[in-house]
């Protein structure tokens, strides 16, 4: 949000008061609109600061960025102001990113931790035998489902 960090702290407290759970993730303030403009969350002509702007003026696209340990953006989810974020989906994606960064796998649609993943098509069957000695279920040559430990 383009609000200052102090405003976010108040919002976080409100969330805790209402739900019993406080957000536990980093939040930044962007009162100079630098980040919001850089990532196209506000129009380029939005001015130079959030000061003097109305709440409607400061209504950024609500965007979730997942940044990897390599400091590269791994996921961008954009939500309109009228729609709350789906934290189950955000956590599911983080689980998938962590799994697929460690193993030569991809996760299918609606995958959840504990479910089968897909061996990357770039992995030969010979290499897959070494990587996944438990075997796999090949629906197609490029679609090899494997139990994930």
Where are these predicted regions, by residue range?
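Chalcogenol-based redox active-site neighborhoods
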Residues: 1-149
């Amino acid at each position: 949000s383009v609000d200052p960090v102090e405003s976010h702290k108040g919002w976080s407290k409100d969330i805790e008061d209402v739900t019993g759970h406080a957000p536990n993730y980093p939040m930044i303030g962007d009162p100079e609109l630098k980040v919001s403009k850089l990532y196209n969350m506000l129009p380029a002509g939005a001015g130079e600061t959030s000061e003097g702007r109305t709440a409607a003026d400061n209504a950024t696209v609500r965007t979730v960025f997942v940044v990897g340990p390599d400091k590269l953006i791994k996921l961008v989810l954009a939500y309109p102001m009228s729609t709350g974020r789906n934290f189950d989906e955000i956590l599911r994606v983080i689980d998938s990113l962590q799994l697929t960064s460690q193993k030569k796998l991809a996760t299918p649609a609606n995958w959840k931790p504990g479910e089968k993943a897909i061996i990357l098509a770039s992995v030969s069957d010979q290499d897959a035998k070494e990587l996944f000695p438990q075997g796999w279920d090949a629906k197609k040559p490029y679609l090899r489902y494997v139990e994930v430990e």
